[in-house]
Amino acid sequence: MFCYMKIKDIVNRDLVNLTNCESEPIHIPGSIQPNGFLLGLDAGTYTITYCSQNTTDFIRLSPEVMLGKSLADIFDQEQYDHFVSYADVADIDPARPFVFILDDIPYNTTVHTSGATLVLEFEPFPDGAIGLPDLYAQTRNFVSLMEKHSHLLDLCKDIAGEMRKITGYDRVMIYKFDADYNGEVIAESKRDDLNSFAGQKYPHTDIPAQARQLYVRNQLRVIADVDYIPVPLLTRGDENTDNRSLDLSLSVLRSVSPIHLQYLRNMGVCATLTISLLQKNTLWGLITCHHYTPKILPHYTRLSALLQGHFLTSQIAVREVAEEFEVGQDVEKALSNSLSLLHQNENFIEDMWDEPSLLKIANATGFVIYYKGKIYQSGNVPEQEDLLPLLKTLSEKYPSEGLHTDRLLDVYENGEKVAKYAAGIVYHSITAGTSDGILWLRKERRETINWAGNPHKAVLVNEAGETRLSPRKSFELWMEEVKNKSVAWRKVELHAAASFAYALQKHINLRYVRNQEQRSRILNEELKAANKEL
């Protein structure tokens, strides 16, 4: 007797119709890219519960035939047994895919778990050949680059070139994110006929928060053709089937946000590869590859590219610490010299306030000590009539915790005159309950930021007054001049400034105690003299 099985797709219609990329549920599209096919298995029974609609583009079995069957019913016993052995581990290594042979064609099969589902993604090898990269040569090249460069930016430039050699993309860029997730292209390798994007910034709205979270979870994403037609995922639609959406966060073939695809089309890009650069499980930056025609990248080439990303990730913290250490050596030397003078001189504030090492403690352009109603200053500082209100405000707002900022006007509204000399400050109180304080100042550094398009036009407001993010249409260079901002303070500079401020507090307290003791001795001697006279 013929039994009709009801089948339904799990395409996320909200995703397809969405106009606001900030709200996109991009991890559950319910569809994949068409350069492979997908099976979802019950992890306990290996029953096929999900199947992409395009299986007959690759093999002779349709979704109607496979859904509800065991994997053992579909593949020969030897391959099934090998796969069970491969998948029966606590953590499946995605870098070590399984190779299925179907109709005499080898398929690279990446496997991962998604809840209670085992997700298998099948991709035919290019030209039917399993081409393995020369990972030894690539590793050797990276080690050579690592030894060649001491600074991170120089290393990134060569890594971009190496990545382009490995993958064959038209353009490779390395982005670094700032604290607000605006991305800057810090290194680039490209075809000679292409315009350079090096030094350009892209607003944080280009990569919404949920996309950044996916980049942390899945460190590689590939798009073979931005004009692809999404392939729906199918599942059984009878009453006894749990038809929840399938989380494809870790998928290679996962269908991409239609808004992101339009964004790429607006750039003229046809295919991409993106690799995450993480530091302490936070997105530090991206390696982004662009191609201007469709491009399918084989798994093992993707693996090589990902390996380069891991290499670079391993060096980011090392190089940043090394560069910080270079600055730190000079700062520590200045701090040591200042502390030595402080301990040797009872009247340090009055006698040594213009010592050059005090500026060098924080690489400042101006330095101020305000003590007992008097200002001691060196370097470039504001007029005293402008400085006194600032010191009063700081002592009231930050009596104990201190303050550092590279944009004074954000914390001091009436500081236009001061900002000319002190766009950035580090402040510490030195005497409790008074306006006494110590201040390092940094002058303004005007900067022109080259945005790839107007960053403010990435956010649109509709007729209902709702804020929406949409794919930008223009990437024409848009220059923004940044004023009233200093170079950011480094951690080592802030630590040195705090250490000296603490030492100065102790010095003042100790001097107060000594003065009190001296006054007591004088008073006692005067009393003794008076008693003798009596």
List each language-model region with its residue ranges.
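Non-catalytic regulatory/interaction regions at protein termini and inter-domain linkers
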Residues: 1-145, 150-166, 175, 179-270, ...
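A generic structural motif
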Residues: 291-297
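Amphipathic alpha-helical coiled-coil "transmission" helices that mediate dimerization
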Residues: 484, 491, 495, 499, ...
